[in-house]
Regions:
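Hydrophobic ligand-binding cavity/cleft-lining segments
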Residues: 1-52
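Glycine-rich portal/gate segments that line the openings of hydrophobic small-molecule binding cavities
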Residues: 38-89
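Soluble, non-transmembrane catalytic domains of enzymes that act on hydrophobic metabolites at membranes
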Residues: 1-2, 6-7, 37-39, 94-104, ...
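Intrinsic-disorder/low-complexity, polar/charged segments enriched in Ser/Thr/Lys/Arg/Asp/Glu/Gln
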Residues: 2-6, 42-44, 68-70, 83, ...
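Short, well-ordered alpha-helical segments
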Residues: 137-150
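Beta-strand/loop substructures that line and gate deep hydrophobic ligand-binding cavities in soluble
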Residues: 85-136
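Short, highly charged C-terminal tails/helix-capping segments
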Residues: 38, 147-154
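Hydrophobic/aromatic beta-strand elements that line small-molecule binding cavities or substrate pockets
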Residues: 33, 70-77, 99-107
Length: 154
């Protein structure tokens, strides 16, 4: 599954780079984080996703109201003020997934343009919940992450 987008912020490229190239700062952009452990360019975290709105149509799925997700990632391919790859693996309720998040930044007048693409391998998760539901949940998490990045820049 691939999700991509772009947005522009009214900040210098160095300020944007300072956040996306720092595992500790970038981890703070992720929504609903319960715990974070950072070691250089590596980070491990746990976060929650409120699954009620995605699983409510499944009878007996009330126990899935909050999904606890474990996620380990590494910042790779750093090209200062240009590009970073955040690659990681996660799991929830015994199901595994992997994400490769490519972030490219460029100067546009006095602003910075951020182009991003997330390649996500959902494995059995898409089969269990259905691709549409998982796509919506993943899109929501990605959009919250982008919104949190914008807030950090202010």
């Amino acid at each position: 599954m691939e999700i991509k987008g772009s947005f522009t912020v009214d900040y210098k490229i160095e300020k944007v780079w300072d956040i996306i190239a720092d595992a500790n700062k970038f981890a703070k952009c992720l929504p609903n984080v319960v715990s974070t452990e950072v070691n250089g360019d590596n980070f491990q975290l746990q976060f929650k996703v409120d699954a009620k709105k995605y699983t409510s149509k499944f009878l007996g799925a009330g126990y899935l109201s909050n999904l606890n997700i474990k996620f380990s990632a590494q910042l790779k391919e750093k090209q200062e003020n240009k590009h970073v790859l955040i690659q990681g693996d996660g799991s929830t309720i015994g199901l595994k997934f992997s994400i490769a998040l490519y972030i490219d930044i460029s100067t546009q007048d006095s602003s910075t343009k951020i182009d991003w693409k997330a390649d996500i391998e959902l494995g059995k998760m898409a089969k269990l919940f259905g691709e549409d539901i998982v796509n919506q949940a993943v899109t929501d998490v990605v959009n919250q992450t982008v919104d949190n990045l914008k807030k950090m820049l202010k």
